[in-house]
Amino acid sequence: MLAFCRSSLKSKKYFIILLALAAIAGLGTHAAWSSNGLPRIDNKTLARLAQQHPVVVLFRHAERCDRSTNQCLSDKTGITVKGTQDARELGNAFSADIPDFDLYSSNTVRTIQSATWFSAGKKLTVDKRLLQCGNEIYSAIKDLQSKAPDKNIVIFTHNHCLTYIAKDKRDATFKPDYLDGLVMHVEKGKVYLDGEFVNH
């Protein structure tokens, strides 16, 4: 019982820190909460959160070639040239505040290409489990985090995965655009959704 209370207090303390950081971020972004009810977490706020817990950031892949009139990078099942530019820009901004992270993607061309352009040379691990978007994705996240408990993790996955997580964890309706993301962390074997990543 005592252990449970301590764990509960720790989780509440972390959530209070998150709220405070989101409020601070809101002073600069004009809104600490998204219209869907998720806390907005920008790069600076994410860096502060990473000092409390290693973070897990899940991104939707960049612009799909087969659903755009923009020029394809190569394979039609991959992303567009614009998508590569957007992914590189996001990666540069992200790495400026979170330089140390392990990088993963699902086993599709579009997520692999997105992660590759995001990372600018960082080692990428492809994991087919990250294509499955039910409770299975939580098991995959916990497994990846357990391999390097002190490392931040970036995962490139799919819109339906992010939509599922937001609904399941916070009953929020989240319809991610290309390269939108969610911020999570793992604590004592449980996966928590902290908020929506906002790139500023």
Curated annotation (Swiss-Prot):
Give the location in the cell.
Answer: Periplasm
* SUPFAM superfamilies per the UniProt record, alphabetical: Phosphoglycerate mutase-like
Give any Gene Ontology cellular component. Answer: periplasmic space
Q: Which domain of life is it from?
A: Bacteria
The pathway is: Bacterial outer membrane biogenesis; lipopolysaccharide metabolism
The protein's enzyme class? hydrolase
This protein's UniProt keywords: Hydrolase, Periplasm, Signal
- GO molecular function: any one? phosphatase activity
EC identifiers of the protein: 3.1.3.-
State the function annotated in the UniProt record. Catalyzes the dephosphorylation of heptose(II) of the outer membrane lipopolysaccharide core.
Q: Which family does it belong to?
A: Belongs to the phosphoglycerate mutase family. Ais subfamily.
Question: What name appears for this protein in its UniProt entry?
Answer: Lipopolysaccharide core heptose(II)-phosphate phosphatase
Query: Which gene is the coding source of this polypeptide chain?
Result: ais
